[in-house]
């Protein structure tokens, strides 16, 4: 009987996104999953990775780079990896955890092949901040035997930085939600972070341009801009803070419209969730968004400075059921996560040993 392959995830295990990856990988019998976290661990890891196969570095990494505290943990991580002796190191978020994994190999002789998953701003934002960050990102990408991107647009930028083998698949859903009940045509929902990169003020402005006392906007999530946004929102807008998964699913299910208008983004899991719940997406004009939304067909692509008008909404509202069915079918066909991870691991195992 063949021994399972030791596979080490390196990332932020307080992120539900890394937990989703861990669940998908742990379900594959040929892998023995180990996880090193730059912070701690969500409780969901308890059911899939035993404590003996986990390392918590207990830092507070900065997604934008400059992670001195994280780099100080490099010797500890390297010692752990030498004990684990993984065949694969899989780093999530290239400018922080990817750098850490690359340095562990380069400076401490850690064995195993490196694979990297880009999450968005590590490719779309961080390399533009400085020449040093750009050079570092390029080195990490070139050290990876395989990388993943959740959009073609981001994959193109990765290739320009030196990545040579990229798998593109959405960071999708674990399961399809049930068919939505009757939608409320007056209800709009938004749940991206209330931080500058997500441009939540654009959501408020777009909604405020629509007439009608019956219209309602529900804004979920939290962030540094919340107080400022609450002061500028009109009386039709309600802020509900961070939501658990079931409560959030309820808002998706009831809302006809979903708003996501960031200034930079790759394929958003939140937009995929909204589409799976039958919402009509209203998104900013970004290359990754255009991979999901065809303006005027299955949603709205709102250009910078463009006002949202009843005339833009009406034709889509008239076809709401057909749009919901088409969007759900696309998500089920293209954006369920487990089959994509299965194909990803098959690709890894097919690579020539170095």
Where are these regions (language model features)?
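Nucleotide-activated donor-binding/catalytic signature segment of Leloir-type glycosyltransferases, i.e.
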Residues: 227-246
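Short hydrophobic beta-strand element within catalytic cores of glycosyltransferases
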Residues: 280-283
């Amino acid at each position: 009987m063949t021994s399972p392959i030791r596979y080490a995830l390196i990332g932020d295990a307080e992120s539900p996104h890394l937990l989703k990856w861990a669940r998908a990988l742990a379900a594959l019998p040929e892998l023995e999953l180990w996880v090193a976290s730059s912070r701690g661990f969500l409780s969901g890891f308890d059911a899939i990775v035993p404590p003996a196969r986990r390392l918590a570095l207990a830092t507070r990494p900065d997604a934008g780079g400059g992670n001195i505290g994280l780099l100080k943990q490099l010797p500890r991580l390297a010692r752990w990896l030498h004990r684990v002796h993984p065949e694969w190191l899989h780093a999530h978020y290239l400018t922080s955890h990817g750098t850490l994994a690359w340095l562990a190999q380069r400076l401490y002789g850690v064995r195993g092949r490196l694979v990297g998953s880009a999450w968005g701003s590590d490719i779309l934002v961080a390399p533009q901040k400085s020449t040093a960050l750009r050079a570092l990102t390029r080195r990490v990408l070139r050290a990876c035997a395989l990388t993943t991107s959740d959009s073609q647009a981001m994959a193109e930028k990765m290739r320009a930085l030196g990545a040579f083998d990229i798998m593109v698949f959405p960071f999708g859903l674990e399961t399809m939600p049930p068919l939505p009940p009757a939608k409320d045509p007056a209800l709009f929902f938004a749940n991206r972070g209330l931080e500058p990169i997500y441009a939540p003020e654009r959501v408020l402005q777009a909604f405020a341009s629509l007439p009608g006392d019956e219209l309602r906007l529900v804004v979920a999530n939290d962030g540094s801009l919340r107080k400022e946004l609450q002061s500028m929102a009109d009386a039709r807008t309600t802020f509900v803070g961070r939501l658990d998964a079931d409560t959030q699913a309820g808002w998706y299910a009831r809302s006809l419209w979903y708003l996501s208008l960031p200034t930079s983004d790759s394929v958003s899991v939140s937009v995929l969730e909204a589409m799976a719940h039958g919402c009509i997406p209203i998104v900013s004009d970004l290359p990754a968004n255009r991979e999901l939304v065809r303006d005027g067909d299955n949603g709205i692509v709102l250009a910078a400075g463009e006002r949202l008008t009843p005339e833009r909404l009406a034709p889509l509202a008239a076809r709401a059921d057909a749009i919901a069915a088409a969007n759900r079918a696309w998500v089920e066909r293209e954006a369920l996560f487990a089959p994509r991870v299965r194909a990803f691991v098959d690709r890894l195992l097919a690579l020539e040993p170095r």
